[in-house]
């Protein structure tokens, strides 16, 4: 299985066993990965469409196979019980979505506090059907002065595609519309409607 190149500056997990596990999982699920991960120490990955819990499994398989050390934001209720330490080890950060106040600032401070960080976010903010992507991920990227890498989960082709790297401009709504257009033809696991 050919995997994309990953730049030397990108945060890595550094485990051959985890890398082998991720590659085996991708092969077992018959998924492939296209595109390249830029050689940057800090960026946001916008992953869409997010329509199923299987998206997490596919995303983790890619993260492990490429030896990426990612941070991701998850619903705080997922971080309870026996899975909490595992999710944190994987890079999970719990958030209370009912209180979005301060989330952008907290994420920006997270970027400022470290030398390397890749933050993966589902722009929809949920698995439910939404009319528009939320704009928080663009605000985070602008506040942290980092680009956004687009990554699609194409279930029709069983392919994760790393797409363009976007430097967000000052018109956040225009950026969100441009990013939505990139994902508009990608079919998630569950149809949106």
Regions found by a protein language model. Name each.
Residues 1-19:
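Helix-enriched interaction subdomains in cytosolic or periplasmic regions
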Residues 6-11, 27-185, 190-193:
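Soluble catalytic domains of membrane acyltransferases
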């Amino acid at each position: 299985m050919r995997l994309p190149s990953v730049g030397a500056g990108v945060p890595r997990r550094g485990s051959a066993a985890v890398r082998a596990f991720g590659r085996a999982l991708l092969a077992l699920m018959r998924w492939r990965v296209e595109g390249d991960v830029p050689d940057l120490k800090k960026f946001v990955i916008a992953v869409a469409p997010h329509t199923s819990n299987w998206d997490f499994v596919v995303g983790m398989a890619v993260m492990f196979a490429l030896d990426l050390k990612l941070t991701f934001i998850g619903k705080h209720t997922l971080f309870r019980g026996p899975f909490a330490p595992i999710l944190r080890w994987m890079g999970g950060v719990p958030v209370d979505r009912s209180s979005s106040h301060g989330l952008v600032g907290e994420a920006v401070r997270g970027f400022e506090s470290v030398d390397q960080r890749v933050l993966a976010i589902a722009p929809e903010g949920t698995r439910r059907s939404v009319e528009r992507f939320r704009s928080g991920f663009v605000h985070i990227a602008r506040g942290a002065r980092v680009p956004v890498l687009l990554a699609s989960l194409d279930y029709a082709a069983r392919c994760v595609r790393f797409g363009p790297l976007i430097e967000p401009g000052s018109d956040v709504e225009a950026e969100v519309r441009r990013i939505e257009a990139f994902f508009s033809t990608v079919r998630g696991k569950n149809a949106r409607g």
